[in-house]
Amino acid sequence: SGFIGSNLVRELLARGHRVKVLSRPGSPEGPLAGLELERVTGDISDRKLLQREMAGCDWCFHAAASYYLWLRDYTPMYAANVEGTRNVIEAAGLAGCQRIVYTSTVGCIGLTQLVQGNAVPADESEAVPETQLTNHYKRSKWHAEEVAVKLAQKGLPIIIVNPSAPIGPYDVKPTPTGQIVLDFLNHKMPAYVDTGLNWVHVRDVAIGHILAAEKGRIGERYILGHAEGNWTLRETLAVLAEIAGLPAPKIRIPYWSALVMAYVSEGIAVATGITPRVPLAGARMARDKMWYNPGKAIRELGLPQTPPRQAFADAVEWFRANRYVKR
């Protein structure tokens, strides 16, 4: 029922597939409300339940993840992202699933490199060393991807997809990337940092999962991004300004200043328990441009390339329609 998962369910249903969804006890229907699907209540720590409920399923999509840039205790995040991944994949293998698509992140792929002063986006051939990972979310996903790779080497039919920065509708939580859009719409972004992301429509990411199940090579990983989606944050905010009819921030904050604000913000969070306005993990991520080359997924899978501008327009429309934006 998360951002990518709920969009994936919609795309599967639109193609005539029968869908079974695992939801935690007490989890609201949220973006899946009203959809014709089979809902199973349980937890990814319950291996017997996973194997039983996946029996008879042709495909398994493991898109669930704990995605936070700040927590008092990161132990549950590692349990969900690493051991949860192992449980789901092994259960899917025992249940006889023909294809297992694991949702990783571009955070497990190398960073943009400067070659003779030009930025060269990273691709699937590059792997970031664990020592260079800037936060616990990335570390947990890095270890989870290692689990998926090792299980694929043992013969399980696993395809790994690495979404970049998805944007679009049904971002209920919202995700940290969706929060950028929401902060802009709610006038909470007076300045920006010099960073960059690869933006992609969440619908294309969802379709990319299905294409991976249909066409992906077992043991391979595919960046689900947009070939023309490598934008600086300044460019991103300029596009948002045009779409939303709001002024874009003009003040650029140097990296060191963002880092200081993050340390102060986290200090307050530790004392109060309130999520920091500027997480240290987010500030550290802003140090590098996170640009990627999705050419492999475009060539091998036929990954759709909806213009990123449309992704932002759809996100703005959804946030406004669902009352996330203060009047």
Feature map (PLM): residue ranges:
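Short-chain dehydrogenase/reductase
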Residues: 78-82, 123-126, 133-145, 175-178, ...
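Substrate-positioning beta->alpha
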Residues: 87, 143, 176, 193-214, ...
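Conserved Rossmann-fold NAD(P)-dependent oxidoreductase catalytic core, especially the SDR/UDP-sugar
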Residues: 80-137
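NAD(P)-dependent short-chain dehydrogenase/reductase
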Residues: 154-160, 164-198
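N-terminal Rossmann NAD(P)H-binding glycine-rich loop of SDR-like oxidoreductase domains
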Residues: 1-17
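NAD(P)H-binding glycine-rich loop region in Rossmannoid oxidoreductase-like domains
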Residues: 27-33, 37-83, 91
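Mid/C-terminal beta-alpha module of Rossmann-like enzyme folds, strongest
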Residues: 208-277, 294, 299, 309-327
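Catalytic helix-loop patch of NAD(P)-dependent Rossmann-fold dehydrogenases
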Residues: 115-161, 165, 189-190
